Amino acid sequence: MLSPKRTKFRKQHKGRIHGLAKGGTDLNFGSFGLKAVEPERVTARQIEAARRAITRHMKRQGRLWIRIFPDVPVSKKPAEVRMGSGKGSPEFWVARVKPGRVMFELDGVPEDIARGAFELAAAKLPLKTKFIARIGEV
């Protein structure tokens, strides 16, 4: 699963996801993409599940790019531990995804296969998405 090799700080505030994505809103690598429509935190496990769904549907043909990376640690206290006595230890990693962000890109496959692969991937993700394509591809 995806996670940073090292970080400046072990723990981070939860924060909020405000506004629209500034960068990463257009297709840069592939011909087809899966774009986020709403703000959400996507975990490393969800990204991996979506990646597996896409690669299985494509039957190992074409090329996949993952355009998001989980770089925010989420801490959690153990079960049945009383409140207080500090913040819990980092449990998993998430990527903060803003609306308009292209999360996955595909190339080297027909449009119907790409659309089907992204439908399977969208079912694994906690946010609404839409299918996008380069002009002239559809």
Curated annotation (Swiss-Prot):
CDD domains: Ribosomal_L16_L10e. It comes from the Bacteria. The keyword rRNA-binding applies. InterPro entries: Ribosomal_uL16, Ribosomal_uL16_bact-type, Ribosomal_uL16_CS, Ribosomal_uL16_dom, Ribosomal_uL16_sf. GO terms for molecular function: rRNA binding; structural constituent of ribosome; tRNA binding. It holds the Pfam family Ribosomal_L16. Disulfide bonds: none annotated. One of its GO terms (biological process) is translation. PROSITE patterns: RIBOSOMAL_L16_1, RIBOSOMAL_L16_2. One of its GO terms (cellular component) is cytosolic large ribosomal subunit. Keywords: Ribonucleoprotein, Ribosomal protein, RNA-binding, rRNA-binding, tRNA-binding. Coiled coil: none annotated. Part of the 50S ribosomal subunit. Binds 23S rRNA and is also seen to make contacts with the A and possibly P site tRNAs. NCBIfam families: rplP_bact. Belongs to the universal ribosomal protein uL16 family. PANTHER family: 50S/60S RIBOSOMAL PROTEIN L16, LARGE RIBOSOMAL SUBUNIT PROTEIN UL16M. This is Large ribosomal subunit protein uL16. It comes from Rhodospirillum rubrum (strain ATCC 11170 / ATH 1.1.1 / DSM 467 / LMG 4362 / NCIMB 8255 / S1). The gene is rplP.
